[in-house]
């Protein structure tokens, strides 16, 4: 480990040509490589949109909202950072234009700029530089990812701030990495460098000369192509790297290491570090690519299935569950709104059913049908957040006989509000940042599946919700066989449920936010194990006829 007391060094990651090139994964992979060389790494994501945070944004526009232990609703890239490194993300690891401006305006209202005209330069850029320094937290290297694409007007204050940082901290303490696209044009049969040249030209016009280029491509760039890019972009030929498309995201660190990226960074930073130890990554990639126990199909019943990024951490946590069981997890995204039309045949094609979190009434009856199918057909089931609430409503209607049972979120006139608004949420009118957010304790009941999977009595998990199970109905559910296996020790809130005799588990929290490839979350490892056992049992039996469950008011 580098000795403390040395200045933090800053790596700024920008992107050009098109969005969704993989800046977040690249930043996370670089973090993994540097951490494996014995360096302490931290991350910061700067997002150019004016929202204070992504908490109120549609998953179709933004993808998943990643929740940190301290209750921040953040960009999904922070999930990559946590999964790839040991760094803990907090609210200081993600800033938006809206949050930066909010800070500056609050200072202006308090009179801290008294007598001055508050401007983008220097006040906004100074605030950006201040949050960059704060995010470093004494780490050896802070990796700063600037969201958006170079050339976007929204990104200009952030780019100006990171331009100034090199002069503030010194050339050896700041490196600019630019991720760009080198497309292969099939009709011409060749790679094209012009988009990269124009992107770097745009960056240089802003005042930033990239120190290294990550060239995203579906094939290796030949040496002469790298030399051409280096010549036209004014970088050293040894600083042009192929960012190769790979089958698994966990192969990205290994791919970049083979390119020599971490060695080049050590040279540019003039920093000594040990050789990277990547055996763990090699093992993980081998398990992902060559599973010994074959493939298992998990059905995700949700309404955001058209954009898989909406469930990014969930998808990766299921992959981790597969790693723990030496199996490949095949995800089948099932649109809950289509289940409401009556055809449940897609559910018969999977080895387990998962109902994830979500908001709003659309698609909820389809999710309830998915729960009913799992319960009646003994298919392994896992309900997360809203998924737990759907399981409660399904059992209330179809086992307890509580006609019209529902959540107050969807029906304020329901005769049986088995899911109700949390006491602390009553009277709350603002939407942003007002839910039950962050890590809370959960006590697990002795003798339950949850306790066995965790191997502990007390756990802490991250939450993002306003509604909870209504404890007024608890005795009725227990009499019908439901086990309340996890409870918040402070407020008595139900955190976990399960049904005996099958793998039927629900949790009010989001365990996917704590899962890593090297430490799969026990609930996902247990769920995938149950799916494998169900798959094997089904293969020993003749296929059952698909049953269509009637769709009615009670699900």
Curated annotation (Swiss-Prot):
Residues 297-537 form the Glutamine amidotransferase type-1 domain. Pathway: Pyrimidine metabolism; CTP biosynthesis via de novo pathway; CTP from UDP: step 2/2. InterPro entries: Class_I_gatase-like, CTP_synthase, CTP_synthase_N, GATASE, GATase1_CTP_Synthase, P-loop_NTPase. Its EC number is 6.3.4.2. L-glutamine binds at residues 358, 386-389, 409, 466. ATP binds at residues 20-25, 77. The keyword rRNA processing does not apply. Allosterically activated by GTP, when glutamine is the substrate; GTP has no effect on the reaction when ammonia is the substrate. The allosteric effector GTP functions by stabilizing the protein conformation that binds the tetrahedral intermediate(s) formed during glutamine hydrolysis. Inhibited by the product CTP, via allosteric rather than competitive inhibition. One of its GO terms (cellular component) is cytosol. Residues 535-555 are annotated as: Disordered. Keywords: ATP-binding, Glutamine amidotransferase, Ligase, Magnesium, Metal-binding, Nucleotide-binding, Pyrimidine biosynthesis. GO terms for molecular function: ATP binding; CTP synthase activity; glutaminase activity; identical protein binding; metal ion binding. CTPSs have evolved a hybrid strategy for distinguishing between UTP and CTP. The overlapping regions of the product feedback inhibitory and substrate sites recognize a common feature in both compounds, the triphosphate moiety. To differentiate isosteric substrate and product pyrimidine rings, an additional pocket far from the expected kinase/ligase catalytic site, specifically recognizes the cytosine and ribose portions of the product inhibitor. NCBIfam families: PRK05380.1 (NF003792), PyrG (TIGR00337). This is CTP synthase.
């Amino acid at each position: 480990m580098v000795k403390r007391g040395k200045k933090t060094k800053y790596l700024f990651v920008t992107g050009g040509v098109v969005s969704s090139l993989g800046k977040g994964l690249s930043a996370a992979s670089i973090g993994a490589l540097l951490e494996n060389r014995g360096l302490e790494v931290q991350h910061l994501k700067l997002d150019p949109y004016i929202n204070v945070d992504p908490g109120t944004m549609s998953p179709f526009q933004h993808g998943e909202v990643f929740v940190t232990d301290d209750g921040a609703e953040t960009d999904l890239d922070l999930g990559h950072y946590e999964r790839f490194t040991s760094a803990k993300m907090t609210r200081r690891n993600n800033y938006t234009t809206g949050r930066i401006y909010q800070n500056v305006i609050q200072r202006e209202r308090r009179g801290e700029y008294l007598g001055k005209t508050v401007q983008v330069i220097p006040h906004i850029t100074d605030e950006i530089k201040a949050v960059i320094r704060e995010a470093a937290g004494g780490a050896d290297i802070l990796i700063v990812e600037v969201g958006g694409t170079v050339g976007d007007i929204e990104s200009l204050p952030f780019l100006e701030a990171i331009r100034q940082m090199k002069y503030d901290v010194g050339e050896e303490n700041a490196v600019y990495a630019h991720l760009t696209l080198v497309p292969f044009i099939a009709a011409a049969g060749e790679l094209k460098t012009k988009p990269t040249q124009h992107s770097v030209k745009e960056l240089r016009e802003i005042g930033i000369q990239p120190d290294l280029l990550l060239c995203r491509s579906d094939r290796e760039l030949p040496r002469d192509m790298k030399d051409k890019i280096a010549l036209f972009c004014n970088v050293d030929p040894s600083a042009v790297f192929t960012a190769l498309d790979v089958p698994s995201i966990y192969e990205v660190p290994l791919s970049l290491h083979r390119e020599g990226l971490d060695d080049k960074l050590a040279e540019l930073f003039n920093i000594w570090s040990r050789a990277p130890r990547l055996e763990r990554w090699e093992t993980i990639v081998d398990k992902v690519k060559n599973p010994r126990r074959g493939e298992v199909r998990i059905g995700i019943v949700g309404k955001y299935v058209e954009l898989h990024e909406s469930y990014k951490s969930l998808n990766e946590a299921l992959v981790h569950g597969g790693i723990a069981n030496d199996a490949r997890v095949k995800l089948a995204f099932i649109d809950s709104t289509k289940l409401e039309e009556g055809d449940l045949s897609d559910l018969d094609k999977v080895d387990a059913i998962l109902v994830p979190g979500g908001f709003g009434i659309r698609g909820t009856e389809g999710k309830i049908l998915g729960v009913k199918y799992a319960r009646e057909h003994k298919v392994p089931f896992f309900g997360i957040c809203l998924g737990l609430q759907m399981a409660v409503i399904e059992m209330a209607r179809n086992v307890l006989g509580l006609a019209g049972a529902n959540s107050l979120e969807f029906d304020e006139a329901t005769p049986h509000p088995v899911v109700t608004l949390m006491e602390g949420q009553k009277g709350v009118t603002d939407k942003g940042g007002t839910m039950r957010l962050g890590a809370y304790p959960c006590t697990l009941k002795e003798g339950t599946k949850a306790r066995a999977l965790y191997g502990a009595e007390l756990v802490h998990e991250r939450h993002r919700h306003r509604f909870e199970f209504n404890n007024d109905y608890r005795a009725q559910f227990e009499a019908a066989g439901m086990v309340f296996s996890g409870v918040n020790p402070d407020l008595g809130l139900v955190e976990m449920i399960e049904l005996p005799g099958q793998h039927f588990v629900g949790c009010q929290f989001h365990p996917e936010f704590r899962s890593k490839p090297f430490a799969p979350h026990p609930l996902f490892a247990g769920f995938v194990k149950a799916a494998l056992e169900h798959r094997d049992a089904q293969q020993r039996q003749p296929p059952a006829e698909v049953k269509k469950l009637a769709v009615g008011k009670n699900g």
